[in-house]
Each structure stands twice: as structure tokens, then as C-alpha cells.
Amino acid sequence: MWDLNDAPHQTQREEESEEFCYSSPSKRVGSFSNSSSSAVVIEDGSDDDELNRVRPNNPLVTHQFFPEMDSNGGGVASGFPRAHWFGVKFCQSDLATGSSAGKATNVAAAVVEPAQPLKKSRRGPRSRSSQYRGVTFYRRTGRWESHIWDCGKQVYLGGFDTAHAAARAYDRAAIKFRGVEADINFNIDDYDDDLKQMTNLTKEEFVHVLRRQSTGFPRGSSKYRGVTLHKCGRWEARMGQFLGKKYVYLGLFDTEVEAARAYDKAAIKCNGKDAVTNFDPSIYDEELNAESSGNPTTPQDHNLDLSLGNSANSKHKSQDMRLRMNQQQQDSLHSNEVLGLGQTGMLNHTPNSNHQFPGSSNIGSGGGFSLFPAAENHRFDGRASTNQVLTNAAASSGFSPHHHNQIFNSTSTPHQNWLQTNGFQPPLMRPS
């Protein structure tokens, strides 16, 4: 139906504009009405059109007219097709959608996967200086030492040249202390022979076996077993843990080899053929047989010869020193006995206090008389006997009689001075 109010030229213009919109391949009409202002044109950008089109001077600004809403917030997700404004693609929504989906998948997987309980290790922290458990490297000695904890105490197992040997020692001790289920460095099948051996030994005995398999003392400076450098500069040989003692001293030697040989001989005497030695035990057969034939020992004689490997000079020196010490001890005991006898004799002959002094009043019978007539004889007789005994003791101890007289006079001088100071004169001895 024609609208009579419109002009014919306006109707013709509207028809031309409509045909132009439908004829253009790169344009489509989103909505159409009689009013020209209500038409919305959406362009599908193409590469050819973008190259031929003259871009405006103003920069392009992209606005997101339909932001995505979370499903929990009650918003409605946009179901509209993706629009392309002047060839610009909106990829943010895709990234957001993909990331949210990935997060949801990860959360779901984390919820579905059950939490695995962590196995607590009973072995404690690993050593910082070694890859093996129970092994520590000491820079000062340059050796690998093995330790194990038992009842809150750290038990020393020995010092070794390699970390592998120290780890083996730790494994053996761990199996002995904690059983077959103990945490060890290597496979349990490697210790079948050790399992048979440790059944007949206690913990302490097995630890001693491990220590004997190590290379010497933990802080020793010698490569030989039972040998360490003494502070005097010589090499000391000793054997530890023997018959309840901490260690048995074997002597000082000029070289390490001599000290090592002394240790080997002592070990063979104590442990027999099973002893762990530094050298081949067969080289000591002749010496040990000669000693056993010349000086037969009984099983009860466990005392070792302390001068086992010393040289002849040092042996004679030690014997001379022992003789001198014994002689000095005997002399000192003899002199002490003599002095004790002399003191008891002097105490038994003390003067009687009932005698009167000259010039005093007469008490009892008679007047004044000489001071201590009878007691002085006994006292001087005791002094003479004591002097003679002391002279003999001084002669036996190596002192000259003249030297002894000087000592005796010096000891008797204070008594005489006291008598003279107080006005008393020593009594005159009656001629016999």
C-alpha cells in the first residue's frame, strides 16, 4: 500500500539504498525497517578489502559489548556468534574459556587422586659428606669413618680408606643391631656370610671385629694397625681391648715397621692364627717358636712383654732404670723404719717432771741438785744409739758420715740454744 504522504523521489531513494545493500557481497543487514536510521550493517572483514580500504587516522579501539559472566553469578553466557570488527578477532574469550576449563580439569584430577602417605625413614638424615648412610669423611685424617647410633649413643665402627668399605661396615652393624629389616646401603643378599658369623657374637664383640677390619686407629697417623705417632716423635705400638683393659702398651719404636711387627706378635700370641696382622703371620713362626721353647708360658700367663720389639740398648736402659728404682725404694723404706725407731726411743726416754730445779723450794726429800741426773743419762744414751743408727742408715743410703754429723748437729743445736738462753747448763757426765 502506498503512502501518499511520502514524496515519490524519497521512495525511489529508499529502494536504491536497499538494492545497494543486498548487492554488496561483503555486507549484510542485521535488521531492516522503513526508517534508514535503524539499519545496522555488520561487515565481514577480508584481506582484499583491508588492503584496498583506506584506514582512518584515529587509532582503533575495541570494546567488548558482551562480557562473559560466571555461571555461579547468575549471568547468562553469550550465545552470539563472534563478531569481527574491522578484521580484529576477539581471542580473550577463548583463552579465558580454555584456561578455566584447564583449571577445572586439574582441580578435578587433584580431588580424585588419593593422597599417598609419606613413609617416615628410621635412619635419620643422610650424611652431608658422603652419599652412603653412616659414613663421614674427615679432612684432617683424609679417611672415611663409619658410625651407628644405638640407644642414644654413637658407636664408632672404624676408619677406612674408601667410602664403600665404610658403608659396608655400617651395613653389617645395622643388620646386627636392628635385624634383617634395617635400612642399609646395599642389598641384604651381599651379607649372607656375615649373618652366619654375627649369630655367635654379641654386639660388643661384633663391633670389635669391625674395628679390627678397619685401617688402624680412628685418629692415628700411621697406615699400620695398632701403630700411632707418640708426642715424643717415636712410634707407639699398642693393642686395644685386651682382657678388660682399655689397651695394652707394647712400647715405643724408631720406625713404623718395628711397631707394626710388635703389634703382630702380640696379636698372634693373644688371638692365635685368627689374629689380624699387618704382615704375613708366617714370618713370625720362627721367633714365636723360639720364645715358646725357651720361655714356656702357661695359659694363665696373660702378661705381655712390654719390651717386645725394642732394641737392645733401650732394653738394657729400661732394666737399669728398674734396678735403680727398686734400690731407691728399699733404701727409703729402710730409712723410714730407722727414723721411726729413733723417734719412739726418744719418746720413751722423756725426762721426769718431778725433778726440782736449782733454787726452788724443797718439796719432798732434800734440797737442790743437778738437773735431770738420771734421765739425762738415758736421754743421751738414746741419742747416741739413735746417732749410731742414723749413721748406719746414712752409710747404706750413700751419704758420708761427715755429712750425717753435720745434719745431726744442725738438728741438736736448737735444743742446746734453748737451755743456754734460759740459764740452764747441761749436766756433767760422771766418768765411768
UniProtKB/Swiss-Prot annotation:
Residues 131-187, 223-280 bind DNA. Pfam families: AP2 (PF00847). GO terms for biological process: cell differentiation; flower development; meristem maintenance; plant ovule development; seed development; specification of floral organ identity. GO terms for molecular function: DNA-binding transcription factor activity; transcription cis-regulatory region binding. The keyword Nucleus applies. GO terms for cellular component: nucleus. A motif (EAR) lies at residues 304-308. InterPro entries: AP2/ERF_dom, AP2/ERF_dom_sf, DNA-bd_dom_sf. Keywords: Activator, Developmental protein, Differentiation, DNA-binding, Flowering, Nucleus, Repeat, Transcription, Transcription regulation. A motif (Nuclear localization signal) lies at residues 119-128. Sepals, petals, stamens, carpels, developing ovules, inflorescence stem, leaf and stem. Residues 1-56, 287-362, 395-432 are annotated as: Disordered. It comes from the Eukaryota. Residues 26-41 have a biased composition (Low complexity). Induction: Negatively regulated by the C class floral homeotic protein AGAMOUS in stamens and carpels. MicroRNA 172 (miRNA172) negatively regulates APETALA2 at the translational level and may modulate its expression pattern. Seems not to be influenced by jasmonate and Alternaria brassicicola. It is found in: Nucleus. Mutations in the APETALA2 gene result in the ectopic expression of AGAMOUS, leading to the replacement of sepals by carpels and stamens and of petals by stamens. May form homodimer. Interacts with HDA19 and with TPL in an EAR-motif dependent manner. Belongs to the AP2/ERF transcription factor family. AP2 subfamily. Probable transcriptional activator that promotes early floral meristem identity. Is required subsequently for the transition of an inflorescence meristem into a floral meristem. Plays a central role in the specification of floral identity, particularly for the normal development of sepals and petals in the wild-type flower, by spatially controlling the expression domains of multiple floral organ identity genes. Acts as A class cadastral protein by repressing the C class floral homeotic gene AGAMOUS in association with other repressors like LEUNIG and SEUSS. PANTHER family: AP2-LIKE ETHYLENE-RESPONSIVE TRANSCRIPTION FACTOR, FLORAL HOMEOTIC PROTEIN APETALA 2. This is Floral homeotic protein APETALA 2. The gene is AP2.
